[in-house]
Amino acid sequence: MELAEFWNDLNTFTIYGPNHTDMTTKYKYSYHFPGEQVADPQYWTILFQKYWYHSITISVLYFILIKVIQKFMENRKPFTLKYPLILWNGALAAFSIIATLRFSIDPLRSLYAEGFYKTLCYSCNPTDVAAFWSFAFALSKIVELGDTMFIILRKRPLIFLHYYHHAAVLIYTVHSGAEHTAAGRFYILMNYFAHSLMYTYYTVSAMGYRLPKWVSMTVTTVQTTQMLAGVGITWMVYKVKTEYKLPCQQSVANLYLAFVIYVTFAILFIQFFVKAYIIKSSKKSKSVKNE
């Protein structure tokens, strides 16, 4: 597939089009909290379809801003930002935990009542609670770019994995929202759960508590497992579409994008785990022996 063809496929959407076959579940939550619904999902979907590429624009501006602020901080002392950091991480932890609890009802109920194929290939009801939390998920990816600002302003090490992950997730999430990617049920749930652990860990650390090493190792393990599971889920959708010739609400172009992102994420997270917990531990144990 040539780049121009791939780009064209990324911009070809069938949702709400004239020949679109409805592939959504009809499940409705038994209870809605006030405002827990997307008003006019068709409007928002078409808006995403028209302007999803601006997620790339935002990502480019994000990279530029990183360089500008790093230059600004070059000869300045780091900011402490203890309390803003606690509030920031605490708010994102609370959001992720609530989102996990509310969103998980839809895929878990679908797995139990409708089976794996429909859960994998039929997207959630666009007028119900799961759609609201899917929409909130997309918006949260913009908010989470703020994580990087705390790292730079506090002059902490900024690794490639961090900013690549933030930018790539934003782009993929917005595109998936534009085409109602059904497997997003799994992608979103995994990310919400991982972030529930991650931001809770960050909040406690920002408060000054020193947690055992196994806690951070567990968080990284969950994140790495999420990426490997993402590769597996994407491969299953590809198999359903190409080998079994069954309909599935996820375009081939979006699948290719998912493969690239999840494979690179898996590699980078494994590398990070090895460097942070295996090589580092090995060096520490050697230095202790030498002493």
Curated annotation (Swiss-Prot):
CC terms in the record's Gene Ontology section: endoplasmic reticulum membrane
Keywords tagged on the record: Fatty acid biosynthesis, Fatty acid metabolism, Lipid biosynthesis, Lipid metabolism, Membrane, Transferase, Transmembrane, Transmembrane helix
Membrane topology term: Multi-pass membrane protein
Pathway of action: Lipid metabolism; fatty acid biosynthesis
Entry EC number(s): 2.3.1.199
Catalytic activity: a very-long-chain acyl-CoA + malonyl-CoA + H(+) = a very-long-chain 3-oxoacyl-CoA + CO2 + CoA
Principal subcellular localization: membrane
InterPro entries, A to Z: ELO_CS, ELO_fam
Keyword Membrane: yes
Alphabetized Pfam families for the sequence: ELO
A GO term, aspect molecular function: fatty acid elongase activity
Residue intervals passing through the bilayer: 46-66, 79-99, 254-274
PROSITE patterns for the chain: ELO
GO aspect biological process, one term: fatty acid elongation, saturated fatty acid
Task performed by this protein: Could be implicated in synthesis of very long chain fatty acids.
Family: Belongs to the ELO family.
Protein name: Putative fatty acid elongase 4
Taxonomic source organism: Caenorhabditis elegans
Gene behind the chain: elo-4
